[in-house]
Amino acid sequence: MRPNKTSLLLALLSILSQANAYEYVNCFSSLPSDFSKADSYNWQSSSHCNSECSAKGASYFALYNHSECYCGDTNPSGSESTSSSCNTYCFGYSSEMCGGEDAYSVYQLDSDTNSNSISSSDSSTESTSASSSTTSSTTSSTTSTTSSTTSSTTSSMASSSTVQNSPESTQAAASISTSQSSSTVTSESSLTSDTLATSSTSSQSQDATSIIYSTTFHTEGGSTIFVTNTITASAQNSGSATGTAGSDSTSGSKTHKKKANVGAIVGGVVGGVVGAVAIALCILLIVRHINMKREQDRMEKEYQEAIKPVEYPDKLYASSFSSNHGPSSGSFEEEHTKGQTDINPFDDSRRISNGTFINGGPGGKNNVLTVVNPDEAD
């Protein structure tokens, strides 16, 4: 026996009912004592924190200081004071506020969604074509506060996926809008394939700030009609539902930050190398200038030493006449018996030269030339 359409629809509702629905409560300066920290996530958003706290069965969750998530079961409105300091954006979704440095953004999870209480029962309804007769089922399931009964089989739900225009197309809302669409399933094979497609996309596209979806369906005359109401405050992506909560929905911004970090690192390395080269050149020029200055001083000192005049004290160079108080006989014994004294050859008051210019004269006599200092008397 082929699967019953109503059973497949109820299975679809049980899957979609696990999607996360939540409402913003308020901004508070503190939390009740039963709130505990769930995680601290680098790409934090309300959708991610909602998923964490839904898995723990909590009734409320709170976002704090960009990236921290807290879960609890007590409504802070009854015991905690409100605050206006929820002004820090979420790291995972910059258009959304994740509390503040001393404030908490508190959200309430949908209680029916959290309990996952969807009753399902087998139905004997089976339709093979639009013209065939249908035995209605009396099964009724309600999973949200907004529900309506339009036929014998009715279900209302809150989730994060939307079926619009036709069973073959699904898309996520991207602006503040309210949309309503309907679709008709006329064959069992079409219902099965569309249910699987919807189930595969129902767990995606959870990046909205505040999203409420209400989907109802009913069977009439062998046909199944879907009616979807969507109320969206804001959303990140439009088109087909391809984004997922957490790191996948923010992969673009993560890549951009990585590129920015690489550029900053490269710029820092280049700047450091240029600065090091400039400092090395300055040190080299300073050392060269000091060496040139020292060389100039050394050469100047050597030059001054070279041109410095030699001084001879007068007492060391007295003339032979003054020291002997008379003319010297010029004997060898007299010169050596009186001792050796330093004599300045250019400071002698008397010069005597004995000798001849011509050893032999015409007459055969040697003439003696005697030169006497005329300033001294004999």
Curated annotation (Swiss-Prot):
Residues 1-21 form the signal peptide. Glycans are attached at residue 65. Residues 286-378 are cytoplasmic. Changing residue 323 to A: No phosphorylation. Glycosylated. Phosphorylated. Phosphorylation serves a negative regulatory role. The modification Phosphoserine is found at residues 331, 353. One of its GO terms (biological process) is response to heat. It is found in: Cell membrane. Disruption phenotype: Lack of SLG1 leads to a significant defect of 1,3-beta-glucan synthesis and confers sensitivity to caffeine, SDS, Calcofluor and alkaline pH stress. Deletion of residues 21-256 results in non-functional protein, removal of residues 21-110 yields a protein still able to confer some tolerance to alkaline stress, and deletion of residues 116-256 has no effect on the function. Residues 22-264 are extracellular. Residues 236-253, 319-331 have a biased composition (Low complexity). Changing residue 322 to A: No phosphorylation. Residues 22-110 form the WSC domain. The chain crosses the membrane at residues 265-285. GO terms for cellular component: cellular bud; cellular bud neck; endoplasmic reticulum; fungal-type vacuole; mating projection tip; plasma membrane. GO terms for molecular function: transmembrane signaling receptor activity. Residues 115-201, 236-256, 318-378 are annotated as: Disordered. Its main location: membrane. It comes from the Eukaryota. Plays a role during G1 to regulate entering or exiting the cell cycle. Involved in stress responses. Has a role in cell wall integrity signaling. Activates ROM1 or ROM2 catalyzed guanine nucleotide exchange toward RHO1. Important regulator of the actin cytoskeleton rearrangements in conditions of cell wall expansion and membrane stretching. Specifically required for the actin reorganization induced by hypo-osmotic shock. Multicopy suppressor of 1,3-beta-glucan synthase (GS). Activates GS upstream of RHO1. Acts positively on the PKC1-MAPK pathway. This is Protein SLG1. It comes from Saccharomyces cerevisiae (strain ATCC 204508 / S288c).
